[in-house]
Amino acid sequence: MSSILPQHRIERVRYELIKRKVTVSKVERAGDGFARISFSGEDLAGFQSQSFDDHIKFIFTDARGQTVLRDYTPSHWDAEQGVLLLEFALHGGGAAASWAEQAAVGMTAMIGGPKGSMIIPAQQDWHLLLGDDSALPAIRRRLAELPAAARADVLLLRPAALAAWSVPRQAEWQLQQVTSQPPCWLPCASGRRRRAMALPGARARAG
């Protein structure tokens, strides 16, 4: 017999894989090196994204006329208004960063997916969120969706990148920087930090 309460069970949901044409409806940029781009369009009817860690294929044409596919987390889906928000990292000089740098209202692209959602209940007593810049959209979305009774610790390589955008503080959460010389990926750095942290005596979820 499972000891996991129903409200703490992870649920997996599958969706029909559909390609959709989307149009840029709004572009915002901030000092954290990200562009927040909103997309709309009739093809978004029926779109679903139930988990903060979902991913879609963003399909666009680069400067050479080549079709490029990149994975992105839906930062927010407003089903009522039919608006999908994606966040693009502008550093690194990649094709997607270049596209986002030039993004303007009226430009079009395609998205595919998500194939499904792994829904991690927000009713955990404590959440540990770890990531580098590529994880910021998922972390921001999770923090915004946590209930007021939740508590979270966030470990990042660049805490200022999270602070540059307003994140609703419905839940109680605190931000810490992971430092290492030379820099390494968070699974490496966070393991040492987690061993030094006083973990709360409650049902927790790390992500």
What positions do the PLM features span?
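Ferredoxin-reductase
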Residues: 9, 14, 18-101
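OB/S1-fold single-stranded nucleic-acid-binding modules
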Residues: 1-7
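FNR/FR-type flavoprotein reductase catalytic core
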Residues: 95-207
